[in-house]
């Protein structure tokens, strides 16, 4: 792991609880992680919170003035062009100027993606960005990354092939899986199952020697621990993401309601408290912080709009892990080495407008 203090630009005005919860998460990050944070947003509101929550680590917090924020009701591409000094734009600009190493935002996800494409650009050889989310599995020592979970409503086989390549790199170097197993989300295990997208993608993944493709993954397989990377289109992935999060929330609520019933239940709950905390750490989305935007030439973590301090802390941790493990550089190196093959597979040019028009820009509630 790198000993260099990573520099993270945080969109302090993005999210339902900005800026207080965003700043609180950043304070914890500079206290516990080897990071330096640029808080981009309204300097008066940010500084007010910092003054009320003094910490020796605050020397590693810097306030960057921004003007405005992209609201959830705004069309992302129009808004980021109309608001050049919005917090998400200036956050991306810090990375572009190499004053920061990564961006974390709990604001408008479509705006974050559009700003990343405009300011940072795509990695050469990658046609579409993808949002990758990490899920727990039945194996406590193993996680699975699913992508795309919301960057693109529609997709093409070659996009999913690229997602598989990027996911494999992340799984290997960040999640620590020496031999990642890649699965294609589908309605059956057999290669003949699925729609046209699934069938053609299966052919590409099977024939690419750089992808350790295990086969189709059914919905029940995603969290089984059998796969380390699962690829799908953003429409399907976003539904999977929100369903999985709701199941985790329901399970935690049921445990809270059922365990304390009666004296025996209260005693049992007291004994099980450490176990319950570990369960929460594994299934609560706040513990994961956010999702990496793959395919852009910079580290960008997209967090929930409902993120509070713990989520922001974990999002900054995710950003630092991506920086320390050189995820972007490794993807760039791979695409450069295999550029001829990638260009041969590319039949059309993807424009920013095409990406923005297909992006899923709703806020995760």
UniProtKB/Swiss-Prot annotation:
InterPro entries with a match to the protein in the record: FA_synthesis, Phospholipid_synth_PlsX-like
Chief location: cytoplasm
Cellular localization per UniProt: Cytoplasm
Pathway(s) it belongs to: Lipid metabolism; phospholipid metabolism
Catalytic activity: a fatty acyl-[ACP] + phosphate = an acyl phosphate + holo-[ACP]
EC number assigned by the record: 2.3.1.274
Presence of the UniProt keyword Cytoplasm in the record: yes
Any single GO CC term annotated in Swiss-Prot or TrEMBL for this entry: cytoplasm
GO molecular function, one term: phosphate:acyl-[acyl carrier protein] acyltransferase activity
Entries under Pfam families matching the protein: FA_synthesis
Homology family: Belongs to the PlsX family.
Function: Catalyzes the reversible formation of acyl-phosphate (acyl-PO(4)) from acyl-[acyl-carrier-protein] (acyl-ACP). This enzyme utilizes acyl-ACP as fatty acyl donor, but not acyl-CoA.
Listed NCBIfam families: plsX (TIGR00182)
Official protein name in the record: Phosphate acyltransferase
Lineage: Bacteria, Bacillati, Cyanobacteriota, Cyanophyceae, Oscillatoriophycideae
């Amino acid at each position: 792991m790198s000993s260099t203090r990573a520099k993270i630009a945080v969109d302090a005005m993005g999210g339902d609880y900005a800026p207080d919860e965003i700043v609180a998460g950043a304070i914890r990050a500079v206290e516990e992680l080897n990071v330096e944070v640029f808080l981009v947003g309204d300097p008066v509101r940010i500084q007010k919170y910092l003054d009320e929550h003094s910490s020796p680590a605050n020397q590693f917090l810097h306030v960057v003035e921004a003007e405005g924020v992209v609201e959830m009701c705004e069309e992302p591409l129009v808004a980021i062009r109309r608001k050049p000094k919005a917090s998400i734009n200036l956050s991306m600009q810090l990375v572009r100027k190499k004053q920061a190493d990564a961006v974390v935002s709990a604001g408008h996800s479509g705006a974050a993606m559009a700003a990343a494409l405009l300011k940072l650009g795509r990695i050469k050889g990658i046609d579409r960005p993808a949002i990758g989310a990490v899920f727990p599995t039945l194996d406590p020592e193993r996680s699975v990354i699913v992508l795309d979970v919301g960057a693109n409503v529609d997709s093409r086989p070659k996009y999913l092939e690229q997602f598989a390549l990027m996911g494999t790199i992340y799984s290997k170097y960040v999640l620590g899986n020496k031999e990642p197993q890649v699965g294609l989300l589908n309605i059956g295990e057999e290669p003949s199952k699925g729609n046209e997208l699934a069938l053609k993608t299966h052919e590409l993944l099977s024939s690419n020697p750089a992808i350790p493709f295990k086969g189709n993954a059914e919905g029940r397989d995603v969290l089984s621990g059998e796969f380390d990377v699962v690829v799908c289109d953003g429409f399907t992935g976003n539904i999977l993401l929100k369903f999985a999060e709701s199941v985790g929330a329901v399970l935690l609520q049921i445990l809270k309601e059922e365990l304390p019933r009666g004296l025996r239940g209260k005693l049992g709950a007291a004994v099980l408290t450490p176990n319950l905390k570990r369960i929460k750490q594994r299934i609560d989305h706040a513990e994961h912080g956010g999702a990496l935007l793959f395919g852009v030439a910079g580290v960008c973590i997209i967090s929930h709009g409902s993120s509070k301090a713990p989520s922001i802390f974990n999002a900054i941790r995710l950003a630092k892990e991506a920086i320390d493990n050189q995820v972007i550089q490794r993807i760039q190196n791979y695409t450069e080495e295999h550029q001829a093959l990638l260009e041969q597979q590319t039949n059309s040019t993807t424009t920013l407008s095409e990406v923005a028009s297909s992006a899923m820009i709703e806020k995760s509630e």
